[in-house]
Amino acid sequence: MAEKQKHDGRVKIGHYVLGDTLGVGTFGKVKIGEHQLTGHKVAVKILNRQKIRSLDVVGKIKREIQNLKLFRHPHIIKLYQVISTPTDFFMVMEYVSGGELFDYICKHGRVEEMEARRLFQQILSAVDYCHRHMVVHRDLKPENVLLDAHMNAKIADFGLSNMMSDGEFLRTSCGSPNYAAPEVISGRLYAGPEVDIWSCGVILYALLCGTLPFDDEHVPTLFKKIRGGVFYIPEYLNRSVATLLMHMLQVDPLKRATIKDIREHEWFKQDLPSYLFPEDPSYDANVIDDEAVKEVCEKFECTESEVMNSLYSGDPQDQLAVAYHLIIDNRRIMNQASEFYLASSPPSGSFMDDSAMHIPPGLKPHPERMPPLIADSPKARCPLDALNTTKPKSLAVKKAKWHLGIRSQSKPYDIMAEVYRAMKQLDFEWKVVNAYHLRVRRKNPVTGNYVKMSLQLYLVDNRSYLLDFKSIDDEVVEQRSGSSTPQRSCSAAGLHRPRSSFDSTTAESHSLSGSLTGSLTGSTLSSVSPRLGSHTMDFFEMCASLITTLAR
């Protein structure tokens, strides 16, 4: 059990020094934290033991947190660690700098349809991931959807949701009334997933319209509107998305759209990245994955026989079984995402003979994809010779490193044209060193600091090119050969912030607050220049946004 300590007048929990308050929730505050050694920023949710003890949910929260630490989805805020003190639980979570979707809509108004669809696809993918692992959110709203620096959605606050099982009904009313389903505000029994679908429908409406489908400052009138299920559909919404909204906002939960229905809807399927809903036909649920079993044993400090007994018990809520399936699912998601983020290393049997290849000016073979030349031979050796321990060490090939980048078989000029298009779309600035080498920077909207990286297109064999990403620290001096050509791509919303939670027995007497206006090649850490602060994480975010944009 960790103890709270003082660090230069600030509270320190474990290795994290707590800073400013990011928000206040039902059970306590959320503060920004900084790792004392690495400087990486995290969000720290503080759960007051006394408050959760009064609700008799201490044991349940502990069990949920144990499983949520294993959740790994690109659009769910990660829970890294839980630190306990005599008075509080400290949930150390992923920090994103873009703020709440709610604030974004309040500031910018309704979102363009294509962008709304992209965000909604990400949100639904995250909700589906949690539902498949028996977790319901029950309080989905734009305030719980966070945005990273590149406008990708990340759902937060799964930590206090109920684990669900077949036949179990959630009797508690929680959440914000504007986003709550009719069965929730009416105090009726509900199973769980369908209330998240309703809330997703409200979020989609807010994205497309900049307002809420059900809204009234008088709570009893608001409840009447929600129970009636009648809402205004603006003329500018196309018929396809309007039918989807009406299906998701069905008052009868039995008639309401399921995630399967939404995924099959024509509007939702447009430009849908496959990594959001991975399918692996080779996966057989009847085959036990030994590596996953070992990983569960390491994380839970248990024996393999205990894990096997949990898997054969058939209890979907057993914590070891849940952990095992999480690990399997995460692996499947990463494999599917490889179409967008993973560029595999070149075939190890390829020969790098410059005389056999035409290399455009400014483009060079990748230095770590070229075997060393033998002094008495004009030809290069096969990289597989490095595995032959019987050969002299002087002839051994140095093991190739992994690099952050994208591999492609397109023409080099076409690759660079796509890079320029993506950089302009992302509002990056760049300097041209030569036709295949750029120095790029992006300004962090929160800190105001610039994140810099080098993009270099390499030839890896006679058919493939590697666009290599390399972090540039502030101390790196720009090469004089580059020509400085910085490039940049070039209302009041009807949303208000409802109460963060409500009790179904007293909700009718509450009034709402006022309106507000308004193909990763892997990464060797040697190719990244880690330093104190969030530079490395900013660099990876920058890489991810560029890779994602190029993949579209």
UniProtKB/Swiss-Prot annotation:
Reactions it catalyzes: L-seryl-[protein] + ATP = O-phospho-L-seryl-[protein] + ADP + H(+); L-threonyl-[protein] + ATP = O-phospho-L-threonyl-[protein] + ADP + H(+); L-seryl-[acetyl-CoA carboxylase] + ATP = O-phospho-L-seryl-[acetyl-CoA carboxylase] + ADP + H(+); L-seryl-[3-hydroxy-3-methylglutaryl-coenzyme A reductase] + ATP = O-phospho-L-seryl-[3-hydroxy-3-methylglutaryl-coenzyme A reductase] + ADP + H(+)
Statement: the UniProt record of this protein carries the keyword Transcription: yes
Variant or mutagenesis effect after changing residue 523 to G: In a breast cancer sample; somatic mutation
Active-site positions on this chain: 139 (proton acceptor)
Domain notes: The AIS (autoinhibitory sequence) region shows some sequence similarity with the ubiquitin-associated domains and represses kinase activity.
Regulation: Activated by phosphorylation on Thr-172. Binding of AMP to non-catalytic gamma subunit (PRKAG1, PRKAG2 or PRKAG3) results in allosteric activation, inducing phosphorylation on Thr-172. AMP-binding to gamma subunit also sustains activity by preventing dephosphorylation of Thr-172. ADP also stimulates Thr-172 phosphorylation, without stimulating already phosphorylated AMPK. ATP promotes dephosphorylation of Thr-172, rendering the enzyme inactive. Under physiological conditions AMPK mainly exists in its inactive form in complex with ATP, which is much more abundant than AMP.
Domain Protein kinase: 16-268
Region (Disordered): 477-521
Subcellular location, record wording: Cytoplasm; Nucleus
GO MF annotation: an example: histone H2BS36 kinase activity
Encoding gene, per UniProt annotation: PRKAA2
Modified residues (Phosphoserine): 377, 491
Modified residues (Phosphothreonine): 172, 258
Family: Belongs to the protein kinase superfamily. CAMK Ser/Thr protein kinase family. SNF1 subfamily.
Name used for this protein in its record: 5'-AMP-activated protein kinase catalytic subunit alpha-2
Comp. bias regions, Polar residues: 480-490, 501-510
Outcome of mutating residue 172 to D: Phosphomimetic mutant
Cofactor names: Mg(2+)
Oligomeric form and interacting partners: AMPK is a heterotrimer of an alpha catalytic subunit (PRKAA1 or PRKAA2), a beta (PRKAB1 or PRKAB2) and a gamma non-catalytic subunits (PRKAG1, PRKAG2 or PRKAG3). Interacts with FNIP1 and FNIP2. Associates with internalized insulin receptor/INSR complexes on Golgi/endosomal membranes; PRKAA2/AMPK2 together with ATIC and HACD3/PTPLAD1 is proposed to be part of a signaling network regulating INSR autophosphorylation and endocytosis. Interacts with ARF6. The phosphorylated form at Thr-172 mediated by CamKK2 interacts with ACSS2.
